[in-house]
A protein has these predicted regions:
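Conserved, well-structured functional cores that handle cations and Mg-NTP chemistry
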Residues: 1-152
Length: 152
C-alpha cells in the first residue's frame, strides 16, 4: 500500500471522528498527526521535511501548510480562511478514544494536570491514559496567579 493510500485511509478515519471540521482542517490534522507518528517528533521542521519527502512536495510548501493550520484566520494567506476552534474537538476526540477503547473493564483512566509556564500561565489538561500515554481531551489556559482548586 502506497503512502498516499495510507494517508487517504487515515483521512477517512479522521474525518469520521471530526465530521464538523472543514476539509482543509481535516487534511491539516491528518498531516500533523501522521507527521508526528512517522517522525517521532512534534517539531514542525522535522515533520515538514519528512512529509515533503513522502509526498514529493516542496519542504517550504508543506511547512507553510502545517503552520497555517494552527494560525488564526486573520494570519492565514488567501480567502475563506477559518479559525480552528480546538475546544470543539474535545468531545469528538473523547468519543473516538472511547470507541477504540479495548478493555474488558468498563473503566477509562483519566488524569487531571495543572502545568505552570513560568509566572505567566497555568495549563489545565484533562487526559485519557492509554498505553502509558496521556491523550488530552479537554484543557484551559489560565493566568498563572489566578486562584483555583489546582493552586489554593
Amino acid at each position: 500500500m502506497s503512502c498516499q493510500e495510507r494517508l487517504s485511509q487515515w483521512e477517512t478515519e479522521v474525518s469520521t471522528a471530526f465530521a464538523h471540521l472543514s476539509h482543509p482542517q481535516i487534511w491539516g490534522l491528518v498531516l500533523w498527526s501522521a507527521g508526528i507518528a512517522l517522525s517521532g517528533s512534534a517539531g514542525i521542521t522535522q515533520i515538514s521535511a519528512l512529509l515533503a519527502f513522502v509526498l514529493c512536495q516542496g519542504e517550504q510548501t508543506v511547512f507553510q501548510r502545517l503552520r497555517e493550520w494552527y494560525l488564526d484566520a486573520d494570519q492565514k494567506s488567501g480567502k475563506k480562511r477559518r479559525d480552528l476552534e480546538v475546544s470543539t474537538c474535545f468531545a469528538p476526540l473523547l468519543r473516538w478514544v472511547v470507541r477504540l477503547w479495548q478493555s474488558d473493564k468498563r473503566q477509562l483512566p483519566l488524569v487531571l494536570d495543572a502545568t505552570s509556564l513560568g509566572n505567566r500561565w497555568t495549563i489545565l489538561a484533562l487526559s485519557v491514559v492509554i498505553r502509558s500515554c496521556a491523550i488530552p481531551v479537554a484543557g484551559k489556559v489560565l493566568p498563572a496567579q489566578q486562584p483555583g482548586s489546582w493552586r489554593p
